[in-house]
Each structure stands twice: as structure tokens, then as C-alpha cells.
Amino acid sequence: MGLLNDTKHEITIEIAPGKTMSIQVGKLAKQAHGSAVVRMGDTVAMVTACEGNPAAFDFFPLTVEYREAAWAAGRIPGGYFKREGKPSEKEVLTCRIIDRPIRPMFPDGYKNEVQVIGTVLSADEKYDPDVLALTGGAAAVWLSSRFPITEPLAGVRVILVDGQYIVNPTYAESESAELELVMAATEKSISMVEGGAFEVPEDKLIEAMEVGHEAIRKIIAGIKQLQGILGIQKAEYVAPVKDEALAARVSALVKDKFLATFRGKHPKTVLYPALEAIKTEAKAALSDIEDPVVLKKAMGYLDEVKRDAMREVILADGIRPDGRAPHETRQAECEVGVLPRAHGSALFQRGETLGLVSATLGTRTDEQRIDSLRGETFKNYMLHYNFPPYSVGEVKRVGTTGRREIGHGHLAERSLAPVLPVPDSFPYTLRIVSEILESNGSSSMASVCGGSLALMDAGVPIKEPVAGIAMGLIAEGDRIAILSDITGTEDHLGDMDFKICGTTEGITGFQMDIKLDNGLPKDILKRALEQARQGRANFLAAMNAALSESRKEISQYAPAILSLKIPEDKIRDLIGPGGKVIRGIQEESGAVINVDDGGNVTISAVARKAGQKAFRMVQELMMEAEVGKTYPNAKVKSITSFGAFVEFLPGKEGLVHISELENRRVEKVEDVVALGDQIAVKCIGIDGQGKVRLSRKATLA
């Protein structure tokens, strides 16, 4: 068979009726510890996985990279260097959807460096390669004996269109989707879901997840088939033997203190120092331990006791660290119009999480240009999320926007998108910026609430206000507590982070990560969604108390944007020879004018009067001469021996014959008018060639 194909194996999986996916191993990147090539249509993604040496970290050092190279779509990148630069937002978001479900597959305590790299090899105009890379990453770590994971995993995209669910849809199918989600799951349980929707009810989300999980099971069956063909035996991870005596000693030192602290109903500003004090006291009590490795192990046992203590208090007493019951949300307060020159602004405080959110209205020239595998597109709505270190009282490097910030911003952005007005009715470019000033969990959800208020404060006519809530879960056997509006501690020590955004009518955005090995039972998922709906209602009420509907007028500091439609055969008249006419209007009015091939004209100006002047000038330019109509401000453009040519409408000239200048005989045209004069004229005729005859004397009393 040759060098390229002697180790190649490939399977084809029908993931839905008439829709297939292939997974190939053994041909490309054979020196990687694991690799898989996944294909749908002509879209192909290759993902590799490599294992390094154990790292001296307190966390699992997994890194995920994903690149959409322009050559995969038969394109050359733009820019001076003509090569791919830093990862795009789409590439960063895809890294996150690969990372989040794969990371929990590895056992606790595993510290070897692992690097997963996804590369798009071919991109057609039908299928998005992101979910192929997700499945490829999961297949790469499973179809290798190096990685000690116990279950294979796969991912799909699901949309809802006209009541039908479609798995791994085409781009065209996705354009009319009411709901879209990307999910990852093992054969038994769902581990990650994220997506957006146009105010769909909760049951539609559950149905979409069930459809997706069924398709994932088919993919996993194919991956297992490949495993059998390759004869791969999975590595077993041998966890370090627990030092029971040391663990018992640590537990005796801190358990009761942790239990008492978590029952103390403390805010974060009290809770965190109290927990740190317990740790400091424990270190002092363990000062006889000289070996730093053993001391580090003891601190690990301490963290386990802390986790168990918080969970026990919630499950046994029904009390959360800040004193709330599981279903209770934190108090929310809102203010709008807090920044004098911002077009719209809001403060949203939820417990100890505070977001300052601004909304800025721009023009068409402010749209973001995106160069992707599908070509160049423009984006007229953006939401940017910033999480400075001072928001949690830390000192860290401030610089490049991190993946977490990009991910949180994307969730908030897509959650607000369904309620925005269509560009035809509101032709502004919108930018929302959320600055997190304080944080104790759910900062991305504060960005959604604050973003909704900032848009309304800016006068953006949104369909409905949107609120977001983060749900958590504590599960130990049959004991389960669903937590509304979780804090940072509950997120870190709990079993679920389920962010749900929506209006009173339905869901607009969501993101779920599950840490449970057996997944989330359907009845618990339903309860969590219902509890989230009730929590959203609390926040919507607080938001409505601050501002119940969009302001009737946009900010005086926002640019004026006016639009009108002109006949397509008049576009050339607006532009003029070499752009002369449109440039003249812009220079005279101070506005900026854009016209597309369909005759849609957009006029933008910093000063409203400038925009209105340009609007009138364009309207006048589109006017046709009417016999019998008087034009009071015609401008003399040129003078001949037989008359004067005047511009009576923008870009339209006519002749005032010398005999039509005065009621008396005129010897010289210059005796009556001069270049640049403005005179009143009346249209007295239009010949067969469209030439306009004008009269000044017809306007004289």
C-alpha cells in the first residue's frame, strides 16, 4: 500500500438520515501520540494530541490550539504579511469548546502536560469545522494508549428550524435557526452545551440536547469500532496512594472550623479571609512536617475537606455560604445613565458582583471587518467583556484579552442579539463594553443584565429586556441541591455551571458545563431550567424598576443616522462622474454618505443638522424637473451670450434663455445675473432629450 496508506484506517458514520461523517487515523501526523482526521462534505479537520512530562503544577496543564488556515478554503490572507496572524475570536471560541469537555475526561491528580492542536485542512461552503475539531480532539486522546481516560467523547451542533431538529447543519440551514447549540457528551452523559436561541421555551432546549446526544452515541460507536480495529488498550492512571493518617490529621484540624464557617452566612469579604485563616492555622499546626512534598499533600487534603464541608452544609442544612437557601437569588440593584457622555450606561449590582456596562452607537464605517474561511464579512454588533484583576482584589498582569474574557463576552453578546432591532430599522453599529468592577461569580450574567439596560438607556429599541442567571448543583448520591445565582465558591466546589439568559418569553443564550460522571438526569435539568426562569424573573423585575423600556430618543452625543431608498438607476446620479456629486454633498453638509448596489442610502453625521441637510440634498437630487414648478434657489453655474445655465436641483441644470431673464429686453446676460448668483426660476418646458427650459421672468411679480 505504500508509506502513506499502510497504517490508514477510516470509518464512515451516518449521524442523521442522509448525513455522514468520516473519521480517519493512521495516515497523517503519525508521530503525534494521538491524531484523528474528521470529515463532513469537503470540510476536513485534523486534530493531534501529545503528552509531555509531569509538570510541577497544582492543576492539569492542558493546552488546546485551533487554527483555520486560509489555504484550507483556497484563499490568501489579507494584510501586508499574507500569512495567518494571532488567533481570531472564532478560533479562540473553538479552542474553548474543545477544551471544556476534554479536560474533565482526565483523572484527578493527572499532571502530565497535554497539548491538543486542531488544524482545518479543507473548508467548504457547507459545514463549520468547529464541531469536527471537537470530535477530532476527543477521538485523538481516546485512540491513543498514552492518555488515561475511561470513556470516549464526541460533539455535534444541533439547530431547530420550522419545528425540525437538524444535526451538524449547513451554514445555509443555520441562517434561519430558531435555536442553535453545540454540545459534547459521552455515551452516557452530556458534559458541555452552549448556544443561543430566539426566545424559545425550555422544553425545546431539552429536546435539542436529546437529539444531539443520540447523534453523539452513533459517533462514539464508530470511535469504539476504530479502537477495536487498532487494538488500542487504554492506559490506566494510578493515583497516588492516599496517606490516610495525614488526611485524618488534617481533617481533625480543620473540618469543624470549615463547617462552622460555611454555616456562618458570610459575604465573600468575610468568608474568604476566614477560609484563608483556617488554612494558615493548619499550616502552623503542621509545622513539624519538614518535607515540602508532604506539606503540599496535606494542603491538598485540606482543600478536599473544605469542598466536602461546603457541600455537606448545603445538602444537610439547606444553607449556602452566604446564608441563602438553594433557590434564592442575591439582591440586585440597577442604575442607568451613570456616565454623562456615554450613549447609554448602566450599573448592575448582584450581591458582590458589579458590572459597569456602556453602549456606544456608531455608523456603518465602525463595523468590524472579519476575515474568515467564508471570506470577508462585516459585523455591526459587538459585546466586549473585561475582567480586571482589581475586581477580585488581585495583582496580575494587564494586557491581551484572555480566552475566558472572549468566551464570557461571546455568551453575553449572543444572549442579547435576538432582541436587537434589525439594521433596516435601526442602522447603527452597536458596541457594548462590560467592565467588571467587583466579582463574586456570575459576572458574565451581570454583563447580560447591564448590557440590556445600557442598550435601553441608549435608546436602542430592543424587543424585550434580557436577564441572565448562573445555576449550580451539589450532588452526592441521592441528595441533590440545585443552586440559583451561584457565587465563585459554589462554582469552584460544585458540580455544574449552567448559565441561562432570556426574556419573559423564553431563552436567548446558554452555556453548561457538568462535572458529574453520570451526567445530569432529565428531571434535574428540567428543575434547573424552571428554577432559572424564576430567578431571571427576579432580576428582570429589578431591571424594570430602573428602566422599563427603551428611551424614545437616542443620546444627543450619538451620531445621527438617516436612511432612504433611491431607484437603482439613480445611483449613478448620486455618485456622479468620479464621485463628484456625492463628494460635493458630503463636503457641503459635513455628513458621510454610503450607498449600496440596491439603492439603500445611509447618511451619518456627528451633528444632527448636518445629517438632515445631507438627507434633503439627496432627496432633492432624486427629484425630477416639473413643468410649472418654481425653484427659489437656483444657482448660476455658467453664462453664455444666449442665456444662463443654472443648477435648480442638486446635480440638475437648465437654461434660462436671455429672453426669459426679465420682462424687458436684455442686451447682455451679465446685466441681470452673475456667476454664483441665486435666483428664482420656473420650469417652462422639457424637450424630448430631457433638456430643461427655465424662466426667471415668470417668477417676477
Pin down the residues of each PLM region.
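Flexible, glycine/charged-enriched surface loops at secondary-structure junctions
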Residues: 108-114, 148-150, 219-237, 269, ...
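Conserved phosphate/anionic-ligand binding catalytic regions in large, soluble enzymes, centered on
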Residues: 34-37, 44, 127-147, 336-359, ...
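Long, charged amphipathic helices and adjacent flexible linkers at domain junctions
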Residues: 233, 237-244, 538-564, 612-633
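Mobile "lid/hinge" segments at catalytic clefts and subdomain interfaces of large enzymes
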Residues: 146-263, 455-552
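Single-stranded RNA-binding regions, centering on S1/OB-family and related RNA-binding modules
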Residues: 559, 568-701
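Long, basic N-terminal domains or extensions that often function
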Residues: 2-238
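Extended amphipathic alpha-helical scaffolds
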Residues: 2-51, 56, 238-375, 559-573, ...
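Glycine-rich, flexible beta-strand/loop modules in the N-terminal catalytic cores of phosphate-handling
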Residues: 32-115, 120-127, 194, 338, ...
